[in-house]
């Protein structure tokens, strides 16, 4: 009898991507989640993957059960039912650790840039050689019998520890997830443990002092802009159309590359992709051709226009990510007003990085703050508010509410950069609706 894979929490970004990948490989897949809409469900619906509400009736002993990491006995009826009846299940990262053993696997780890880099690597490789992939924006592609598997490798709660890939990219090490990690040393320790799992090669950003501290049985290739990097980008040109650079491996030029993406961080992402592909022996001309056609991933500098107004949607929710996103906006729109609309994500992160958030938000011309989006894992003890953060920002900064986003209308030809990992897209949609109403009234 054909096995059924049931996903508890199928709308999660990693879970939805994994479900899609298994479906494309011909597996029978279904899943359950809340009835709220998530952007990840669109691909599942297009693939006709059954989406069910949480219910213990969904759980059968013959199913392969895969559970999202956030779900426990006390908050999910399916997990409670499985435990009560002794039905085995695997967490997402546990299942993935076993799954990748059938491929030459390439992980992408790092505090920032995982999803964009995974998407870029998957795009390039899948256009050259059969490659299955799993991206953190909810995108997955499964090819039965493919040689390579590209996946996003998450450090939170050390979820990447069941993974033993042949190769990995490490984009950076930074302190995040203060609800779990105690500090930068704790984060670095997690990456060191992960490095020990890698079988054939690590590609690490060379200007990151903590990545330089790592040791591993597999060789470590550093990439960046400095002379002591194994893979180095030179002759960098950043314009309103994207970025271009020459790539060198230990002094030997391996190609000229153009990527239609913005910000220094995306040059580094592209260089890491070039490094992996070069190490695998892929043709550099083909790599250059397919880098040029990369169009990004969901919720990473995703642009749209409403009349003359530019709206950018980005998942940035850490100071380092906000700085990179605003830098990218400046590169593409150097002569326009940059308006940051940021929703802090989790109270623990907002408390831990309040000063850093204020500092990087000053890179915008004007700042608006949405109410803090608390996670399901925490309780608001009223230790910090969005207004507290606004008071720290030197540039003009206001707090807005979802039921009144009209202050955002005060900027002619503004470039609005909506950033956050909570429900910031609701503010964005409210603003788009308001813009459309204003445009209609003016006609």
UniProtKB/Swiss-Prot annotation:
Short name of any one Pfam family annotated for the protein: Mur_ligase
GO molecular function: ATP binding; UDP-N-acetylmuramate-L-alanine ligase activity
An example Gene Ontology CC term for this record: cytoplasm
E.C. code: 6.3.2.8
Positions that bind ATP: 110-116
Pathway(s) where this gene product acts: Cell wall biogenesis; peptidoglycan biosynthesis
Family per record: Belongs to the MurCDEF family.
NCBIfam families for this protein: murC
The name this protein goes by in its record: UDP-N-acetylmuramate--L-alanine ligase
Organism from which the protein derives: Lactococcus lactis subsp. lactis (strain IL1403) (Streptococcus lactis)
């Amino acid at each position: 009898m054909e096995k059924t894979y049931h996903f508890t929490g199928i709308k999660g970004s990693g879970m939805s991507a994994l479900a899609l990948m298994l479906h494309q490989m011909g597996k029978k897949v279904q899943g359950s989640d809340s009835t709220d809409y998530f952007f990840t469900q669109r691909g599942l619906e297009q693939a006709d993957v059954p989406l069910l509400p949480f219910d213990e009736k969904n759980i059968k002993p013959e199913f392969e059960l895969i559970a999202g990491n956030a779900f426990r006995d006390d908050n999910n009826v399916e997990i409670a039912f499985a435990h009560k009846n002794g039905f085995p299940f695997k967490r997402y990262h546990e299942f993935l650790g076993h799954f990748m053993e059938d491929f030459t696997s390439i992980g992408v780890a790092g505090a920032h840039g995982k999803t964009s880099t995974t998407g870029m690597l998957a795009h390039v490789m899948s256009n050259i050689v059969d490659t299955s992939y799993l991206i953190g924006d909810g995108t997955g592609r499964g090819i039965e019998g493919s040689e390579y598997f590209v996946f996003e490798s998450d450090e939170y709660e050390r979820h990447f520890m069941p993974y033993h890939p042949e190769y990995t990219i490490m984009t950076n090490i930074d302190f995040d997830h203060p609800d779990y990690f105690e500090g930068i040393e704790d984060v670095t320790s997690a990456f060191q443990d992960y490095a020990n799992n890698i079988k054939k090669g690590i590609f690490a950003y060379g200007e990151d002092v903590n990545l330089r501290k790592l040791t591993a049985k597999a060789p470590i290739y550093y990439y960046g802009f400095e002379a002591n990097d194994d893979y180095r980008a030179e002759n960098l040109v950043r314009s309103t159309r994207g970025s271009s650079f020459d790539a060198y491996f230990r002094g030997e030029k391996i190609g000229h590359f153009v990527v239609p993406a913005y910000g220094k961080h995306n040059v580094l992402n592209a260089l890491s992709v070039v490094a992996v592909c070069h190490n695998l022996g892929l043709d550099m001309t083909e790599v250059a051709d397919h880098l040029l056609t990369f169009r990004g991933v969901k919720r990473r500098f995703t642009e749209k226009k409403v009349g003359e107004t530019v709206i950018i949607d980005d998942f940035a929710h850490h100071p380092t990510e906000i700085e990179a996103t605003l830098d990218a906006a400046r590169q593409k729109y150097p002569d326009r007003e940059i308006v940051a609309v940021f929703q802090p994500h989790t109270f623990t992160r907002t408390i831990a990085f309040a000063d850093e958030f204020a500092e990087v938000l000053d890179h915008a011309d004007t700042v608006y703050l949405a109410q803090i989006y608390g996670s399901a894992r925490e309780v608001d003890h009223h230790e910090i508010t969005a207004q507290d953060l606004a008071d720290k920002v030197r540039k003009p900064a206001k707090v807005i509410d979802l039921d009144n986003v009209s202050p955002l209308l005060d900027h002619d030809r503004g470039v609005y950069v909506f950033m956050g990992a909570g429900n910031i897209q609701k503010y964005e949609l409210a603003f788009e609706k308001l813009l459309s109403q204003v445009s209609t009234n003016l006609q």
